[in-house]
């Protein structure tokens, strides 16, 4: 469950290390984002030689949340951290590698490139 001012780790090799959520996309009153949702973020920490610089405003898709998500079959899934993958304007990942597992809900949100790059889909 991601909302404004939530800090997230970056799960790709774009050069950013930490993001802060600015806005949850999908309606004017939408407060929370979960797995597979697109958010607007500010880069808070970045590597000096990366593609993404500190202070940039980027779009990202949430791939891991600490708050558990209930699946259709009744099972719950949660992760150890909040993490996101940075997207470009065509909703494709900027990085070429994805680190750590991603939730299956990312596939249902039609981010197939992220699913194919991920080492594990839970």
Curated annotation (Swiss-Prot):
**Keywords for the protein's UniProt record, in alphabetical order:** Ribonucleoprotein, Ribosomal protein, RNA-binding, rRNA-binding
Biological process (GO), any one: translation
Name the SUPFAM superfamilies for this protein.
Ribosomal protein L14
Q: GO CC: one term? A: cytosolic large ribosomal subunit
SUBUNIT field: Part of the 50S ribosomal subunit. Forms a cluster with proteins L3 and L19. In the 70S ribosome, L14 and L19 interact and together make contacts with the 16S rRNA in bridges B5 and B8.
UniProt lists the family membership as follows: Belongs to the universal ribosomal protein uL14 family.
Q: What role is this protein assigned?
A: Binds to 23S rRNA. Forms part of two intersubunit bridges in the 70S ribosome.
Protein name as annotated: Large ribosomal subunit protein uL14
Query: Native species of this protein?
Result: Campylobacter curvus (strain 525.92)
Gene name per UniProt: rplN
């Amino acid at each position: 469950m991601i909302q404004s001012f939530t800090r997230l780790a970056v799960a790709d090799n774009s050069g950013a290390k930490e993001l802060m959520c600015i806005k949850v996309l999908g309606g004017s009153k939408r407060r929370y984002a979960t797995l597979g949702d697109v958010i607007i973020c500010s880069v808070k920490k970045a590597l000096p030689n990366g593609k993404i610089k500190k202070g940039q405003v980027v779009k990202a898709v949430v791939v891991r949340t600490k708050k558990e998500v209930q699946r259709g079959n009744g099972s719950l899934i949660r992760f150890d951290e909040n993490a996101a993958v940075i997207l470009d304007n065509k909703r494709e990942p900027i990085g070429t590698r994805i680190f750590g597992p991603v939730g299956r809900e990312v596939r249902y949100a039609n981010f197939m490139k992220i699913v194919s790059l991920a080492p594990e889909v839970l």
